Amino acid sequence: MVFSKISQVAHYTPKQVISNDDLSQIMDTSHEWISSRTGIEKRHISTVEMTSDLAIRVAEQLLAGSGYDATALDFIIVATISPDASMPSTAAKVQAAIGATNAFAFDMTAACSGFVFALAMADKLIASGAYQRGLVIGAETLSKIIDWQDRSTAVLFGDGAGGVLLEASEQQHFLAEALHTDGARSQSLTSGQSSLRSPFSQGQEVNSFLQMDGRAIFDFAIRDVSRSIAAIIEQSGLAKEELDYLLLHQANRRILDKMAKKIGMPREKFLENMMHYGNTSAASIPILLSESVQNGQLKLDGSQHILLSGFGGGLTWGSLIVKI
């Protein structure tokens, strides 16, 4: 059988950093108010770089680290809710920029679960035996879809990108998977809504900015996502103690605190970096993954077990247990 493994990780964020104090200059908020409720202290906000620019920088790093030429790639998947345009896809722009002429490329829209969903799909592509390697990238410029007059959302989000190189392996590294969607609760978190505009249609005004029912999302994460994580750990056959770290979507420190108690695992096993980046949606998990390899917490030598879990708009939520 053919399996897949994560062989390279990388991340990139815009240079401009906006602190909570900076936000307090343009809206009614404060560092204490934001940090005490979310754990967020600052975020990176793009000045000129688009989502594809961030993703391209990640792709270039992944190739440089691997030693592969871009023509060796079979596919590129970019998870994003803030693409440069509806078409061409962000992934197509990455493919062109790095010269991956043999790769097919497409975007995946699953909000903050996007990277986990995309990684699960990429694992199946390689396991089919038809493809040898590809890039999976989460990239966002959420700053362009936020209403900067709405402090309930504007203080939460940031821009950035992260990704992995996935390639064929003789050993199994993806040990368990659980992906979920509940479209009946879709109105709890929305963005990019559009109206019919033809001369033959009856359009209506819509709010295209990101809108979120914070309490509903908080409750959803604590209830549904925690239950799913507990179930996938049991499904994997691993004892909780055998999981080295859990890398969850970086939405809110309070969510991680409550999840640790709900699942019954030590809080120190839940890695976090939302204090530096805010919520970067599909980019949050791969940025955290890359940073954790960079700082030595994760070895990338096949000796550790980690759980990746994303949750957000859709509603969507999904988890993977990976030997890394």
Swiss-Prot record:
Stored SUPFAM superfamilies: Thiolase-like
Subcellular location(s) of the protein: Cytoplasm
Record region (ACP-binding): 250-254
Residues the record marks as active site: 112, 249, 279
GO MF, any single term: beta-ketoacyl-acyl-carrier-protein synthase III activity
Top-rank EC class of the record's enzyme: transferase
CDD domains assigned to the protein according to its UniProt record, in alphabetical order: KAS_III
Keyword Transferase applies: yes
InterPro entries: ACP_syn_III_C, ACP_syn_III_N, FabH, Thiolase-like
Chief location bin: cytoplasm
EC number: 2.3.1.180
A Gene Ontology biological process term: fatty acid biosynthetic process
Pathway(s) it belongs to: Lipid metabolism; fatty acid biosynthesis
Keywords tagged on the record: Acyltransferase, Cytoplasm, Fatty acid biosynthesis, Fatty acid metabolism, Lipid biosynthesis, Lipid metabolism, Multifunctional enzyme, Transferase
Reaction equation(s) it catalyzes: malonyl-[ACP] + acetyl-CoA + H(+) = 3-oxobutanoyl-[ACP] + CO2 + CoA
Cystine pairs: none
Keyword Nucleus found: no
Domain of life: Bacteria
Residues in the signal sequence: none
Annotated domain remarks: The last Arg residue of the ACP-binding site is essential for the weak association between ACP/AcpP and FabH.
Classification via PANTHER family: 3-OXOACYL-[ACYL-CARRIER-PROTEIN] SYNTHASE, BETA-KETOACYL-[ACYL-CARRIER-PROTEIN] SYNTHASE III, CHLOROPLASTIC
Its biological purpose: Catalyzes the condensation reaction of fatty acid synthesis by the addition to an acyl acceptor of two carbons from malonyl-ACP. Catalyzes the first condensation reaction which initiates fatty acid synthesis and may therefore play a role in governing the total rate of fatty acid production. Possesses both acetoacetyl-ACP synthase and acetyl transacylase activities. Its substrate specificity determines the biosynthesis of branched-chain and/or straight-chain of fatty acids.
UniProt name for this protein: Beta-ketoacyl-[acyl-carrier-protein] synthase III
Gene: fabH
